[in-house]
Amino acid sequence: KVCVVTGGGSGMGLAAAKLMPKDRIIVVSGRTESKLKKAVAQLKAAGFEAYAKSCDTSKRESVTALAEYAASLGEIINVIHAAGVSPAMKVTMEDLLRINALGTVYVNQEFSKRMHKGSVIVDIASMSAYSVPDLMVPKKAYALAETDEALFIKKALRMTAFIKDAYMKNGFAYAISKNFVTWYAAKSAYEYGPKGIRVASLSPGLIATDMGNLESEHGGEMLAFSCEGRMGTPEELGFAIA
């Protein structure tokens, strides 16, 4: 039985992988090979059979190659889609939509073709998914992600024209990308349910991962209103995912 973790080279993805049953074959994927090698070494030291496979989730062909590789190792039973980017990573608004939103489409579609009854996909969203007022969420554009990617991105980012601050523009695009993840996970759950495949999304707050630490300056504003008053740990999220 195979468990695939996108964005599994570090952070909550790797933490979740370490908490999977020891009989799982773990495949960690990402774009930084040095991180993947370290992750595989840690997983093997913990007693797992583990492999690394580079993957750019913003490209369908790369996701397809990952799915095919995982299927060649055994029955894919778990997919944890933790790969993503945030505004502090110096990416464009379009990058945020392509990697976070369209990447989720590619992962769910390509892996579901190779999964069977009893398997599970967990798409990692964000608390930011719920930070945008409903009137500003372009849900009517979401279905375009499967039929016209360019138009989907154009319509999803339409409201950013009214935002002047560059970081706030990217923050809005990020929130929309993660709101899309929650929507698409629900859509996938409905579509794949008859095959016995479960799909769920998880929306973390600010987590002390490499990506989360980049957001800590702006995220401090959110922490001031949180009940814990601190960032979450990758291990806490890994437990919730696994």
Task: Please provide the spans of the model-predicted regions.
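Catalytic loop of short-chain dehydrogenase/reductase
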Residues: 86-89, 120-194, 206
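Conserved glycine-rich cofactor-binding loop
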Residues: 7-11
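Hydrophobic structural elements of the Rossmann-like NAD(P)H-binding subdomain
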Residues: 80, 122, 199-202, 212
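Rossmann-fold cofactor-recognition segment
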Residues: 43-61
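C-terminal helical subdomain
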Residues: 106, 174, 179, 201, ...
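Conserved glycine-rich Rossmann-like NAD(P)H-binding loop of the short-chain dehydrogenase/reductase
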Residues: 23-38
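Short, flexible catalytic-loop segment of classical short-chain dehydrogenase/reductase
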Residues: 130, 203-214
